[in-house]
Amino acid sequence: MAEHIFTLEAEGDEHIWRQMNVHLHLYSYDAEGNACGVVSANNDTSHKSGKKLSVCTPKPTAEAAICLYVVPKGLPESDRVSDSPPLKLTLRVLRDGQVIDSMKRQVNQFGGDQLINVRYK
């Protein structure tokens, strides 16, 4: 089975970075499906560059799984749902530098968002 470098990117405007804690996790698996590592980033670390947060596998791997957790830092400016539209976040998964998946997430300002164990080969 071929091995690849996987990258997980999250991109959004300044509102999501100011109002949410964004956590990315990228898990590595060998050809037999055994876990062999995890790398993480959040918007409180030096991984954040402007409007983008990213993390990549440190060495080639047969398979990768992604997890996203978006947790509110506090309550929205208004307690009215109609005044607090979802925040937009774009996730991209790259394999050897080429985009293999892209998702547009609508992040609830009151409850956040999560995406768990989506796998790529």
Label for each model-derived stretch:
Residues 96-121:
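C-terminal partner/receptor-binding element of secreted or periplasmic proteins
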Residues 91-93:
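Short beta-strand scaffold segments in enzyme catalytic cores
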Residues 17-23, 81-89:
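Short coil-to-beta strand junction motifs in C2/discoidin
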Residues 1-47:
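Acidic/polar, low-complexity intrinsically disordered N-terminal segments immediately downstream
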Residues 30-82:
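Mature extracytoplasmic domains of secretory-pathway proteins
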Residues 3-5, 50-54, 115:
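Intrinsic-disorder/low-complexity, polar/charged segments enriched in Ser/Thr/Lys/Arg/Asp/Glu/Gln
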Residues 12-14, 72-74, 95-97:
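Beta-strand elements of well-folded, non-transmembrane domains
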Residues 4, 64-66, 87:
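Exposed beta-strand face motif in extracellular beta-rich ectodomains
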